[in-house]
Amino acid sequence: MTSNDPVRRAETLREQIRYHNYRYYVLDEPVISDAEYDALMRELRELEAAHPELVTPDSPTQRVGAPPSEQFAKVQHVVPMLSLANAFDEAGMRAWYDRTLRLLGSDAQVAFVVEPKIDGLAVTLIYRNGVLVRGATRGDGEIGEDVTANLRTISSIPLRLGSFANDDSAPTNPTAVPPLLEVRGEVYMRIADFMRLNEQLAVAGEKVAANPRNAAAGSLRQKDPAVTSRRPLRFFAYGVGQVEGVALQTQWETLHFLRALGFPVNRDARRFERFEEALAYCREWMTRRDELEYEVDGVVVKIDSFAQQAELGVVGRDPRWAIAFKFPAREAVSRLLDIVVNVGRTGVITPNAVIEPVNIGGVTVRNASLHNADYIAERDIRIGDYVIVKRAGDVIPHIVGPVVARRDGSERVWQMPATCPACGTPLERAEGEVAYRCPNFGICPAQITRRIEHFVSRSAMDIAGIGEKQVQLFVERGWVQDVADLYTLTPEHFHGIEGYGPKRIANLLNAIAESKDRPLHRLIVGLGIRYVGEVVAQILADHFGSLDALAAASADEIDDLEGIGPAIAASVAEYFARPESKALIAKLKRVGVRTEAKGPAVAPKGDALAGKTFVITGTLPSMSREEAGALIVAHGGRVSGSVSKKTDYLVVGSEPGGTKVAKAQELGIPTLDEAGLLALIGANDRSAPAASNNNQNAASATSRGTMAEVQQLGLNLE
């Protein structure tokens, strides 16, 4: 109940906002929606505007964010990292523009830069003489957290600045790297990468992230940089703090300057001479948000001129020269009717919410993810609760948390069932894992269905024409009990089934038959072994060459492979030790599925790299990492995904992974650039050349013939 006493109400609002700031900025676990948080801030602003005597120095309206976590060293920002005022409609945008003109003068010539407001984690990067020396989070705007080691692992953040002078909009002397440069930007995670990461975490029995922003924030704030290096983080630069040695005049010039130095800058940023044009671009963004590969929660409109920015100044926590045009919330409140559990292909039990239908962003949502039992317990989510439901882009809607204030006492605490809902087997939970599992691997019908769906998926055997409905039909009718049974289907099975005419049946059976000859690593992916995705499957296929050899390998033998850890090795060995797995492999052979690696499509060009193990990091000048890897393999070498004492060379391109470079230096492993790699191949010499700074002229003398070989391998170097 809202108090009529403005003093008490202001104190209450400040405490609520501080608490929610702590949940959002420090714990990365918000418990209210963005719209509800904005409503609290608006009420406090209006209250303080009506009663100026209530404004205190520590009011949330006078600060940014929350105190930093004690987990990392604190960093004092020399130039504060400001927040932004928000506008929620065009009327708010026009009010901001009118205020700007009143301050600058009605005859002022004002240009605007409009940039997408990426929903990630704001960071600052400090470069001295072109070398990254420190990186920190925004924290409360005054003090952040030192996450330098973790930021170094993000490949889109340059460790040393270069010059890309072909950007005509950069300053007149883009080759001069400033002696001091502080770059501000956003660390984020693409939606597709987020979904893949959550799948991996769920399979591993680890805690999943609620959304891409939380995934990015949690990944960046890992204590171990090695963990961060395995997360698909990206970076966009959008501004500067401290700068020495270059006089930047505008925001637009700054964006081009940053791009010229090698920073990724969002190419959807635009400059406009008129406010109405800028506003029209904001409207366009509202219609495009679902088409993007990353989450945005609005657009930022900035006054382009730094001189005008300085004239406008800052009030409280917000610069007067910029505003965030926030998009309508992709959240809604609905009632949680029930919690049902689904069974995954590896037996993981996942709770899902059944809610009263609610429209979120033009889509009717009836079901939402609850991730796992711990997620429900930590947030005290109960059946009958009114809950906040969030949907963003193509990400599955999920429950953020309950609206506790709306409880009436009829809500029920949910408990994870003791047995599998599909087969009745008692559930198990391994020590240290958040996931419950059904151990009835070979018989549980839900696991069978999920495994077949995975087997036919694009990343595995890629069988066209088979989806969830088809698999359900096959299993319900008893035609298919395991993936090998797919290859026993005949036209007679489909006789009399509605929707299955002769042409559709022929296409379906042809697609199944064609999949028998898929590469070995695709088959390994299709088996659905825990922790085994495309990269691990390729390593296993390359080393063992057949399912028989892989099945006969011990966990120790598998663990010895580059890029394979003990958890993966144990999972693979455990899978092939099961009687049902052995029976499945025998059955796959009987129905004609290839269980051995295919011969090389192109005969090896030589053995110049025989016995040598390479790791590739960064962006190479004339070929992708995949193309470089194919070239190494064609000359007898092998490629690994991680640096270890077994690595012979690290091939380094621009913007390399900091962890790999540091590990190579620690182990004394020689590094090569692209020219050095080509020289090593062209010289047909297995001895290690001088590391890193090989003679470019000598390399070029041998590279023409080698590049011709790349073309013969069918590799596109454009």
Swiss-Prot record:
GO biological process: DNA repair; DNA replication
GO molecular function: DNA binding; DNA ligase (NAD+) activity; metal ion binding
Residue stretches making up the BRCT domain: 604-694
Annotated EC: 6.5.1.2
Name of the top EC class for this enzyme: ligase
Cofactor(s) named in the record: Mg(2+); Mn(2+)
Active-site residues, record numbering mapped to chain: 117
InterPro entries, A to Z: BRCT_dom, BRCT_dom_sf, DisA/LigA_HHH, DNA_ligase, DNA_ligase_AS, DNAligase_adenylation, DNAligase_N, Hlx-hairpin-Hlx_DNA-bd_motif
UniProt entry keywords in alphabetical sequence: DNA damage, DNA repair, DNA replication, Ligase, Magnesium, Manganese, Metal-binding, NAD, Zinc
This protein's record includes keyword Zinc: yes
Entry-linked SUPFAM superfamilies: BRCT domain, DNA ligase/mRNA capping enzyme, catalytic domain, Nucleic acid-binding proteins, RuvA domain 2-like
Binding site for NAD(+): 34-38, 83-84, 115, 138, 186, 302, 326
UniProt catalytic activity: NAD(+) + (deoxyribonucleotide)n-3'-hydroxyl + 5'-phospho-(deoxyribonucleotide)m = (deoxyribonucleotide)n+m + AMP + beta-nicotinamide D-nucleotide
Binding site for Zn(2+): 420, 423, 438, 444
Recorded family membership: Belongs to the NAD-dependent DNA ligase family. LigA subfamily.
Function per UniProt: DNA ligase that catalyzes the formation of phosphodiester linkages between 5'-phosphoryl and 3'-hydroxyl groups in double-stranded DNA using NAD as a coenzyme and as the energy source for the reaction. It is essential for DNA replication and repair of damaged DNA.
NCBIfam families (alphabetical): dnlj (TIGR00575), PRK07956.1 (NF005932)
Identification of the protein by name: DNA ligase
Species classification: Bacteria, Bacillati, Chloroflexota, Chloroflexia, Chloroflexales
GN (gene name): ligA
